[in-house]
Amino acid sequence: MLPLNSVRTHAGRLVPVMLAALFLAGCPSQAPQSPAMQQRVEGKAGASSDYYLQQMQQSSDDSKADWQLLAIHALIQEGKLPQAGNQLGTLPSQLGDKQRQEQRLLTAELAVAQNDMNAANTMLAQLDVKSLSPQQQERYYQAQIKAAQDRTSLTLIRAYIGLEPLLQGDAHQRNIDQTWTALTRLNQQDLSSMVINVDENTLQGWLDLLNLWQTKAQVPSDLQAAIEDWKKRYPRHPAAKQLPSQLGGTPPAAAAPTTGETAPTGGNAIALLLPLNGQAQAFANAIQQGFSAARSGQASLAMPAQPAQLAQAANNAAAATPGAPAVPSPASSTPSAVSPTPAAATTVMPALTAATAGTIPVKVYDTSNQALANVIAQAQKDGATTIVGPLLKNEVEQLPGLNPSLNVLALNQPEHIQPNPNICYFALSPEDEAADAAQFIHKQGKQHPLILAPRGNLGDRVVAAFAKSWQQQSGGVVLQQRTGSMYDLKQAINSGAGIPLNGQPVITAASAPQPSTTVGGLTIPNQAPPIAAVTSDGNVDAIYIIATPDELALLKPMIDMRNKGASRPALYASSRSYQAGLGPDFRFEMEGLQFSDIPLLTGASPALMQQVSTQFRNDYSLVRLFAMGMDAWKLASDFSQLHQPGSSLSGATGILSASSDCVVNRKLTWLQFRQGQLVPAS
């Protein structure tokens, strides 16, 4: 079967070319090289190396070198580097001009595959790019880009610019994004020392666009107007037709490797499995955009930031986005159970270098219209070594039964974890936040917490996760109390009586009695111990509230109304209560309340937060999923770190660490409302 990568440029002429090649093999030794054979030599090897080597053995002297060059190309693509080197060494000394060009290009590509970048650059310098065919030019620029090892330089940027007109579709948009990423990494010294030729209008346009972005990025409306003016000055510039994704362009639909990019032997290749159609499409798109932005280097956090800096940035963000719609946390839309096992984070995972990121190919697969088993099989057939996804919980629950041989970073969690050395689970869930809240509240010295949660499945899950984590901290009893609808809350606040805190103990698996006892073959049900009601007149000293901002605006005053004085319990909330554009009245009303959220939304990178929030129209649920995509890239690109005890990673969704079952836990950022401002929680 022919490799898939032959389809892109040669599908239309593959059969006639094969017939022409077979015809040549039977021609007399004096037959001239056909144009079709030249195209095959200059293009991408479409068959296996074994086939080409067999044709080489059966061919006359005139066409033998052509088949040998094709065999060398195929050997490099297949990762058979020693054999490719041996064949290069046995090429005849007398080659035609076009054959000599192909030999030099193959030598450079082999050097890149062997990580001998000095040799690759030396050989590339001997090639006249203008004399190469379009297919060879594409390979030439790809080799230049790889030889640069993602070290930003004028040579690298010129290679991206040279490659651009040879690409189409998603590959073209990725080229635009990669060019922009390389430009944004230039420092002021690089820019001031750059010498531009008079005919490099495209490069000059890129530099002018970069200058606009650097000077006007703080005011999005000014930047947008400047970009429109720039488009008028450079109407034929590639970025005028397709802006970089960071500046508002459409991200590639599938982050597949660019043409000619192949995973090195034994290297990493990632398959991203997402539902690109249907009800979860918006969630999947946000994750994919975050994943792609992190991979290309366009989105990263300046971690670690100081708590005061985070609080100030969050204040600025809240003031800058008034009137945003209330949006719940995405946790409720992607339910998953957490089995938190706190890890002592003593080792920080090393940051992935840009050079490493650039060498990891990624391809996106749509899980919305085919069985998960088929998608995984196709990804494995395409050469993937790591799978990120699936996202939907029902598909995640299928993974243990499929027993995949690839590494899998699932983007959700099943109700019950079945340990598997190849599967890790990374989810944004209310249970995850509740477990982190239990640890945070316990560290503040609280002894008797109460959870105020809504009736229904969401409340059940949060209560169970909080209680389980709390018992792992201290073994104490957790109380729970359920809240009603907005109508019920409004009726209660109109009564003026406040909320009586009549909590009931949470029965967890650890504290639940055995259901029965067997004596002499007779089963006797155990009697459950009586559960006494506990009120705030007792010893409740902390209340963890699960509520939307509108619900919280009713709940907190009623709690304060009923519990006055110095002994009132401390109040805590989840990210469900935090949204864009919280006005000053709300912030003053929330005095003293502490809440948690992901670093991206609490000010770890104000510029990125503003950009992504604007992109998603202040829908914080999608911003959180964008951050999840960023962290999924970090985790998947160095999957082995997840299995190292004690390791942690500073991510956009929190400080990440993995349990013994490879469940990724998140330590969130905590802030507090104080005098109308957000300050670090003490």
From Swiss-Prot:
Q: Which GO terms describe its molecular function?
A: enzyme regulator activity
**CDD domains, A to Z:** PBP1_YraM_LppC_lipoprotein-like
Q: Which domain of life is it from?
A: Bacteria
Tell me the compartments it is located in: Cell outer membrane
Tell me if Lipid metabolism is a UniProt keyword of this record. Answer: no
Provide the alphabetized UniProt keywords.
Cell outer membrane, Cell shape, Lipoprotein, Membrane, Palmitate, Peptidoglycan synthesis, Signal
Lipid attachment residues per UniProt (N-palmitoyl cysteine): C27
Instruction: Describe its assembly.
Output: Interacts with PBP1a.
Q: Which family does it belong to?
A: Belongs to the LpoA family.
Q: Which PANTHER family match?
A: PENICILLIN-BINDING PROTEIN ACTIVATOR LPOA (PTHR38038:SF1)
This chain's protein is named Penicillin-binding protein activator LpoA
Query: Which species expresses this protein natively?
Result: Dickeya chrysanthemi (strain Ech1591)
